[in-house]
Amino acid sequence: HCRLRRQRQMCIRDRYKNAQMTTSIRNITIIAHVDHGKTTLIDNLMKQSGSFRENEVVDERLMDSGELEKERGITILAKPASINWKDSRINIIDTPGHRDFAAEVERVLSMADGALLLIDSAEGVMPQTKFVLAKALKQGLKPIVVINKLDKADQRADEVLNETFDLFVSLDANEEQLDFPVIYASGRSGWASNEIDGPRENLNPLLDLVIDHVKPAEFDKSKPFAMLSTLLYADSFLGRSLVGRISQGTAKANQQIKAINLDGEKVDEGRSTKIFRYEGTKKVPIEVGEAGDIVVIAGLEKANVADTICDTEVDTPIQATPIDPPTMSIKITVNSSPLAGTEGKKLT
């Protein structure tokens, strides 16, 4: 047992060592209307890119890990994953498609260098498509349009492409954004093609398009470490875990760090007890996280979303994108009316 455990640990270390030698990182988010196939597409991207062992049992909709997500069949929380393709690592962020969870989409766009805009080839442009695309364009992202579910009998890919172009124009996209690449796919069947009637073999054309079209952002690794906290997870062992893209410098395990809010006030200070990176859907521990990568940091119990996690010598917070205020707010308090307690017993 000990020998097998040591061999397994050596294999894992070799994997991580090789992963750290990747030449570039692409951070992309997948945005779409609800039920247009984001999570199913990611499932097949992970399987075809070799993220799982041959003998590993893989669930459907593996990104939907929450009980409520599995029960409802929808994505509620944004979640990162990672795949290695050729000489690059692609961090993929799955986002909710339902408008009730739109704030999740807004937050994760700040971590992305590019976006895949998925559109159902039969349903076409839907209300949430417009919302998420507007947010992506405002961030300056240049989306790749994926016309999905092309295996449907009632697909109308050409019309949907025209609808999509009209949507870009109506949202005041610039010339670079209007010159968006298009690829046709079936996430469920696991293929993508540059032409409607092109070969339908695998998802390699989509991964190649991501590498060619999404340029990795440039970061200064010589500056002190700083990262905008974008997602927050609770861990029964490590406590509060903060997810974000490192904006500058490098994050190291057991490094003295602090959290500052948008006003530059210190919220918390401590040591980064653990640093993780995503390999597939799993979190794997690393010693050093570099600028541009999406990492998970544990060790700060008071830090929150939109706080800047940084080296102790950093004083300037990273500006977070303001999230749209709620359409309606409700305040529930104790009934302090003079007539409180005088209601009748029969309530119906």
Residue ranges with predicted function:
Residues 1-14:
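Single conserved hydrophobic/aromatic residue that forms the stacking wall/gate
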Residues 13-348:
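Structural and coupling elements of P-loop NTPases
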